[in-house]
Regions:
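Hydrophobic, glycine-enriched assembly/anchoring segments
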Residues: 268-316
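Long, charge-rich C-terminal accessory regions
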Residues: 129-278
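Histidine-anchored nucleotide/phosphate-binding helix
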Residues: 16-21, 40-55
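A broadly used, surface-exposed interaction patch
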Residues: 48-113
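Short acidic, S/G/P-rich loop/turn micro-motifs used as interaction or catalytic elements
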Residues: 11, 34-40, 64-69, 97-103, ...
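Conserved, mostly hydrophobic/aromatic
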Residues: 30
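Internal, conserved structured core segments that host functional sites
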Residues: 102-137
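N-terminal basic/disordered segments at the start of proteins
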Residues: 1-26
Length: 316
């Protein structure tokens, strides 16, 4: 099973809503880390992907480590209470690491005794054997590179491997040196390593920032499967390099022309990628006024659609 870890910003939530039916049909699960108090947006998103009798395809994290809520326990609990009132059996997540005490895990579970829980291991919690005895914990998600194989072996319940597959560079311009890169092959081999699921941070990576300045160069990132060996690669498109800022519409026009040419050469994408179809529409209408957030939304949406497509054709 594929799990997608996202921070709950507006465009990420829109990408989920855009792809709700494909997410459900492909049995994709969302791990959602709230970053601000945005209950209305969250509820709207949840309504699109959760069934009234089954909320197992979403993990809502109770203790975010980035964003406005990371140090605001009152708002975290208040928002979580509102969510669990509407989605009674939603799965809740707890981020744990080497600083986490067993009593902290017990505390979160005591607040929501009727829910199932998933632990997201961003480090190695002391005395992990005690965790195996908590019946409400149904799965463990292990962040690769942050925990050891020996630590993972101590857990007996459902195991998911989380990886950051996106090679984030400091400047968009830097992607010119490697326009096509390996992204992941975990969908092909996760069971061989003893995992019941695999997870990543989509085409955003384990990165969080609020706002930001307008870039000199815009970038768009698109995942695709290599038809020779079924691994997933990622391609980067850039607007023309420059040393001064210009209106986003000018950068988007340069960027979109190259993307459109690629889609024309790989027209089979249009059969399953609504994100690529939307990009074609922008090109045909000479519409270049969309925001950088829209590019991110389309990139994330396309990745959902790719994973659903690979599931449909039996790749994993």
């Amino acid at each position: 099973m594929y799990y997608c870890y996202l921070r709950a910003k507006r465009n990420e939530l829109l990408a989920i809503r855009d792809c709700a039916e494909k997410i459900k049909s492909a049995n994709i699960s969302i791990i959602l880390e709230p970053v601000r108090k945005n209950l209305t947006e969250l509820i709207t998103c949840f309504n699109s992907i959760l069934d009234s009798d089954d909320s197992s395809n979403l993990v809502y994290i109770l203790n975010p480590i980035v964003g406005d809520l990371s140090n605001n326990q009152f708002d975290i609990i208040e928002q979580a209470n509102q969510i669990t009132k509407q989605f009674h059996n939603i799965t809740l997540g707890i981020i744990v690491d080497q600083r986490t005490d067993y009593s902290q895990v017990e505390y979160w579970i005591s607040l929501f005794p009727g829910n199932s829980f998933v632990l997201i291991h961003f480090g190695e919690i002391p005395n992990p054997n005690t965790i195996n005895n908590i019946p409400q914990i149904i799965s463990n998600i292990f962040y690769s590179g942050h925990v050891s194989d020996n630590y993972i072996s101590l857990f007996t319940k459902n195991k998911i491997l989380l990886e950051d597959c996106f090679n984030r560079l400091n400047r968009n311009y830097d992607y010119q040196h490697s326009m096509v890169e390996f992204f992941s092959d975990r969908h092909l081999n996760y069971r061989n390593y003893g995992f019941q699921g695999f997870a990543n941070f989509s085409t955003i990576g384990d990165y969080y920032a609020e706002g930001g300045t307008q870039p000199y160069t815009t970038a768009f990132h698109l995942t695709f499967n290599n038809e020779q060996n079924a691994v997933i690669n990622i391609r980067h498109w850039l607007s023309d390099p420059r040393t001064y800022r210009e209106p986003i519409s000018i950068l988007n026009e340069e960027l979109l022309e190259d993307i459109y040419n690629m889609i024309n050469q790989n027209s089979s994408l249009l059969a399953w990628s609504s994100a690529c179809n939307e990009l074609v529409q922008y090109h045909n209408l000479n519409n270049y006024s969309y925001s950088l957030g829209t590019l991110k939304r389309l990139s994330v949406r396309h990745h959902f659609e790719l994973m659903a497509h690979l599931k449909d054709i039996g790749i994993y």
